[in-house]
Design a protein with these regions (language model features):
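Nucleotidyltransferase catalytic core that binds NTPs
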Residues: 1-182
Length: 182
């Protein structure tokens, strides 16, 4: 008989979550599979989309996927090191498990070594790059609808976030060109 592992009190992740999608939802669920509470730190750096809109969409997608949001805490942070440190310090047992996506394996190892914490890697099932591609190429609207399970509200909010991101990218490029001319 296989024993279930005793979950950690807390799990922690850090990310931009600029355009939340199903892969992020799977990451949050994996956090809950390994801990009592999931502390999801969403970067509040200036180069990101609006924090409240990102969390609103991520929470909506989690709720739609029946993720237990009573155990999920969305927080702001400037860096992953601060995120992990705050989670560990506030934990009753001064421990946490770090959960990151497969594209962050080297960084996860670094955090693990620094804080002496275990790491769980969430395998990639979707990517922000893929989502941007489907949003930018309108001929893939059907694929985008499928990726958001036909949820028009989620698709609309994701498109707003993508437009915010593109506006920022275009503004930066225009500033670079202006700076190069001057």
């Amino acid at each position: 008989m296989k024993k279930q592992p005793i979950p950690y009190e807390r799990s922690v992740t850090f990310g931009r979550f600029n355009i939340p999608h199903s892969g992020h939802v799977e990451l949050v669920q994996m956090m809950l599979d390994h801990s009592e509470e999931a502390h999801v730190y969403v970067s509040d750096g200036a180069s990101n989309n609006d924090w409240d809109l990102r969390v609103l969409l991520l929470a909506h997608l989690c709720r739609s996927a029946n993720v237990d949001l009573n155990r999920v805490y969305f927080r702001k942070a400037k860096s992953p090191f601060i995120s992990v440190e705050q989670t560990i310090e506030s934990s009753p047992w001064q421990e946490a498990v770090i959960v990151l996506g497969s594209d962050q394996q080297d960084f996860a190892r670094s955090l693990s070594n620094h804080f002496d914490c275990p790491v769980v890697i969430n395998r990639r099932s979707n990517s922000s790059t893929q989502m941007r591609y489907f949003m930018d190429a309108e001929i893939f609207r059907e694929d985008l609808t499928h990726l958001y399970n036909g949820d028009e509200w989620a698709i609309t909010l994701a498109m707003i976030l993508r437009k915010e991101e593109r506006y920022r990218e275009e503004s930066c490029e225009a500033s670079r060109k202006t700076g190069a001319v001057a």
